[in-house]
Each structure stands twice: as structure tokens, then as C-alpha cells.
Amino acid sequence: MRLVLLGPPGAGKGTQAQLLVDRFDIPQISTGDILREHVQRGSGLGIQARAYMDRGEYVPDELVVRMVMDRLAQPDARQGFILDGFPRTVPQAVALETALAQAEQPLSAVLKFAISDDMAVRRLSNRWTCPACKRTYNLEFKPPANDRVCDTDGVPLERRADDDELTVRRRLALYREQTAPLEAFYHERDLLVAIDAEVREAEVATRTNDALDGVS
């Protein structure tokens, strides 16, 4: 199973990705993690990427795709993978499509976890995290037993600065502007599968599993 996950902030992609990892026994691959790993160990690709980063420039799509394909060649990805956070643009999607075709590893599906902006704001603006154990709560949907205090270790919870409503709405607007062409790209290839992610996590998981039944 070779998957790409799309969805705005607050859609619950991370939760669903972990469930898919467990179901299919395939790795979840983050391009951010790949890039950091190459740079830290000073690989050939990492040295090239570092040069762009040091100049304050974006790492070119071609270089990112080469890093992704290098990761997909690892033994744990032979039976499939989950790409989260890449591609973000149509040129990246085209480059990935070409590389996967050459490797005879075409995508199985592109899952779009759909939620309204209002729901995303409710989820993110109410999100608080324990700085000690990293457990995450939602004051509306999954609150701690005691107000803004972690159930596990009693540490006061903290909220990310960019989780205020105004910033969240800006992030959502940017996301939709960037990904609308990408969704159209995958829709044209009959790969896009839309999943209503406004319901509870367990129901989203059920809908995701149902959507993937029969997909190879």
C-alpha cells in the first residue's frame, strides 16, 4: 500500500497515519525528517541541501524527491509507505510520479482528510500539550480531568503560540491555496479519496479502512 495523506491542520492526519502504519506494517515517512537526517549525517544529498538552506533558499524539488526515493528504497518500505507532508505542490507531485513510475512503485491512493475551517479552529485553538510527557488534550473534545493540568504527571499544560484562532485561519487559507491544484492533479488520475474527518477518530478510521478495501 503506497499512500499520500492530504488534509489541513487539525484534520487528524497524524492519528490516522499511525493507525495505517499499524494496519499495513508500513513506515510513515516525513520529508522534514528525511531532510534533517541527511543534513545531520552529511550525506551527499544532505550537503547539497545544506548549501541551499544556508543561503536561505528552498531545497529544490528534484533534490527532495531524490531523498524521498532514497528512503523508499529502504527494506522497511518495500511493501509500501505513507507519505505525509509531501508533495505540497503540483511540480513536486509530477516529480514524485515520475520517480515512482521509474521504480515501478505507483501510488495506491491519495487520502484527503476533509474538515471545515470552523472545525479545524475548534480543534487547534483548544489544543493544549503537556511540556513534560507531550500528551495532547483538547479542552472541548478531550479535556484533562483538572483544568489545564496533565492527567499523567500534574504538569501545567501549554498551548502553541500559533494555535490562536487568527493564526490558525491564516494557516488554513494558505493550505487551501497551496493544495487545491494538488487535489485536482490527483483527482484527474483517479487517485484522490475524500474522507469526512469531522467525526470521531474511531469513525474516521473506519471510513479510512473502508475506503482502502480493495485498493492495492
Task: Give residue spans per PLM region.
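Glycine-rich phosphate-binding loop of ATP-dependent small-molecule kinases
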Residues: 1-216
